[in-house]
């Protein structure tokens, strides 16, 4: 469902690609394109993710992902498809409209997918100064923490933690969180989770 929505969106918005800018980007070495594409994607996805926490109706979709009381790599796939589509479009659309090559686009999606699994993993590894450059389990576990106002709405980036630092939302103490999840009830089965955002609050 998410992929279909992205394909339709890309098809209809293709006319917005600006050829001179696209040609300038494609003239760059591939690795430079890849670095720029990662930054563009992560800034876009950062704001989509942040809006998913601050806009009430978006949070109702995103809460499905945050409902895991413990974190492991499978939590990366505990998603509402509409939430996933929204956040991914926020990251992918700017990359597409700038006209990056399909090879760069594919490599970016591959990295983002692998890293999403890794940062949700139930591991207690620390990586020193690298934790400021690339998202790690420690960084993302604090995004899922439920330990009070100090830890709320932090670490929205999925790739580059310094993006959170730039926008004032980075939080990375030396310890790992002890409590995860949300306070609101969430159905245990997938069908219930799909319907939950649309149920009226009592």
Q: In which residue ranges do the predicted regions lie?
A:
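A membrane-cytosol interface segment of integral membrane proteins
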Residues: 178-202
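Membrane-embedded catalytic scaffold of the fatty acid hydroxylase/desaturase
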Residues: 1-9, 14-15, 22, 28-177
């Amino acid at each position: 469902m998410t992929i279909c929505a992205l394909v339709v969106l890309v098809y209809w918005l293709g006319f917005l690609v600006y050829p001179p800018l696209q040609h300038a980007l494609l003239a760059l070495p591939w690795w430079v394109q890849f670095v720029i594409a990662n930054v563009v994607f992560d800034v876009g996805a950062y704001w989509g993710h942040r809006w998913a926490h601050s806009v009430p109706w978006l949070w109702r979709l995103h809460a499905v992902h945050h409902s895991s009381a413990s974190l492991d790599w499978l939590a990366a796939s505990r998603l509402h498809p509409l939430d996933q589509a929204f956040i991914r479009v926020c990251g992918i659309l700017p990359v597409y409209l700038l006209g990056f090559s399909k090879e760069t686009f594919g490599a970016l999606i591959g990295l983002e997918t692998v890293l999403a699994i890794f940062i949700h993993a139930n591991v207690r590894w620390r990586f020193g100064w690298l934790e400021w450059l690339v998202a790690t389990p420690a960084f993302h576990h604090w995004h899922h923490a439920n330990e009070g106002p100090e830890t709320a709405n932090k670490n929205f980036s999925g790739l580059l933690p310094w993006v959170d630092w730039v926008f004032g939302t980075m939080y990375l103490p030396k310890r790992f969180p002890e409590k995860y999840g949300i306070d609101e009830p969430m159905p245990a089965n997938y069908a219930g989770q799909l319907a939950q955002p649309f149920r009226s609050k009592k």
